[in-house]
Amino acid sequence: MRIIAISYLRPFWETNPDAEQPLKSWVDEVKKANWSQPSDIKAQYRSASILKNRRVVFNIKGNDYRLVVSVAYRFQAVYVKFIGTHAEYDLIDAETVEMES
């Protein structure tokens, strides 16, 4: 899978250093993945939440951080839509959130 907007992850782990290794591991795993449907994601990440609009929520570092992505299965692309703490995640709508520029 190709990860789009991966550049948003670096500033996050620079301010949350304990998220760096878990996020880098997630990036490595996703780049090697070949997902064609939501069940492929669930097979690899049992704790991932599949939402409407091709959105998926991943727990990072246990449940300390949340990563929301949109998956374009046909194009083998994952778009980063949100990265934040669990508390920050509780304040957003994961089905519509977009990264701020």
Residue map of PLM features:
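Basic, Lys/Arg-enriched alpha-helical interface segments
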Residues: 1-64, 72-77, 86-101
